[in-house]
Amino acid sequence: MTRPLILTLKMDDRSQGRFDRLRELHFPPERNYLNAHLTLFHKLPGDRETGISTDLQEVCRDQAPLTLTATGLRSLGRGVAFELTSPGLMSLRRELARRWGPWLGPQDRQGFKPHVTVQNKASPETARTLREQLQATFSPFEVEGVGLSLWRYLDGPWEPAGTYLFSERPKDGRT
């Protein structure tokens, strides 16, 4: 049986480092075996990896880097996430969902709310305290999406299956 696939946004190094540091500080260490990530699709069929890879190469070839804005914090009950907005990311995800619609699972058919989790599996009190601390100094900031990363789910850890960088030029040819 093939392993399910996960698709995430590849962020610029500065943003990735910022979220990773927060995750290292606030995620329970025994559960923190992944870097911070923004998941676009949670469970793609592993037996379609070749076709998915082809689609990602095609879509990323015509996609300029994306600007996302961290607009606030979201309570996860037992954790905290940064909420992000980007019309371009929403459009890209819609296009991929259109291509892969027949085999998307229930979680990937739900509404897409981009976020990066920096704490999870904590007590509700610990999560509430962290959210209040982060909220006290929060101001919106930009994150650059530079590509997409495909992963194989290994019952906990993830194994890299491919990285697809966005084009450095807009798809309409303008610079």
Tell me what each language-model feature is.
Residues 1-175:
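Histidine-dependent nucleotide/RNA phosphoesterase domain, centered on the 2H-phosphoesterase fold
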